[in-house]
Amino acid sequence: MLVLFVATWSDLGLCKKRPKPGGWNTGGSRYPGQGSPGGNRYPPQGGGGWGQPHGGGWGQPHGGGWGQPHGGGWGQPHGGGWGQGGGTHNQWHKPSKPKTSMKHMAGAAAAGAVVGGLGGYMLGSAMSRPLIHFGNEYEDRYYRENMYRYPNQVYYRPVDQYSNQNNFVHDCVNITIKQHTVTTTTKGENFTETDVKMMERVVEQMCITQYEKESQAYYQRGSSMVLFSSPPVILLISFLIFLIVG
């Protein structure tokens, strides 16, 4: 009788604890994974929650959130965000190397550049053509009208290869007129005797100017070498290096 009474009392207690229809958790949200329709289910039904495989949230593989492999967000490989594989490619690219402009190339071939194929000759800087009077009105007018056809740069070798100014100027005039004549003749333009006479005068003045410029630079370089090779200067430089290193 005692056992029957305990069993009956337990059955009545369970009946009182059963939820009534229409209350909480009846058809609403169930956890985990109950089969009632609707509501948010976890796992793995499609819904909207944090970390779900098919929903829309943070870190989901198919939803729309941050870092998702198929959704739309920042850094996704298939979505439409920054750096994503799909859509427009907003990937970073290495900056293209700057192209060398003609201005920089011209600067590299400035005054003092060794000219290939001329046996060590260098091409001087462009100069203004000197105003020269030839002694008669016809030649003066002819020069003013044709001076643009004459060289404005000279070819020369280093001044230390010549014993005096005359040798430098003579060689400078010959090679400059020869090169200018050959180049101009190749273009279909010929020079008359008057042109050659005027070119010789013009180029001679330019070669003298080039010699003076190169001589001054040469002596300045020599003075600098003598200054830095003197024992007191060497001792001073060594002392400064010792102070810096020490």
Curated annotation (Swiss-Prot):
Residues 16-223 are annotated as: Interaction with GRB2, ERI3 and SYN1. Residues 224-246 form a propeptide. Its main location: membrane. A lipid is attached at residue 223 (GPI-anchor amidated serine). GO terms for cellular component: Golgi apparatus; plasma membrane; side of membrane. It is a lipid-anchor; GPI-anchor. Residues 45-88 have a biased composition (Gly residues). Residues 18-102 are annotated as: Disordered. Residues 91-102 have a biased composition (Basic residues). Monomer and homodimer. Has a tendency to aggregate into amyloid fibrils containing a cross-beta spine, formed by a steric zipper of superposed beta-strands. Soluble oligomers may represent an intermediate stage on the path to fibril formation. Copper binding may promote oligomerization. Interacts with GRB2, APP, ERI3/PRNPIP and SYN1. Mislocalized cytosolically exposed PrP interacts with MGRN1; this interaction alters MGRN1 subcellular location and causes lysosomal enlargement. Interacts with KIAA1191. This is Major prion protein. The lineage of its organism: Eukaryota, Metazoa, Chordata, Craniata, Vertebrata.
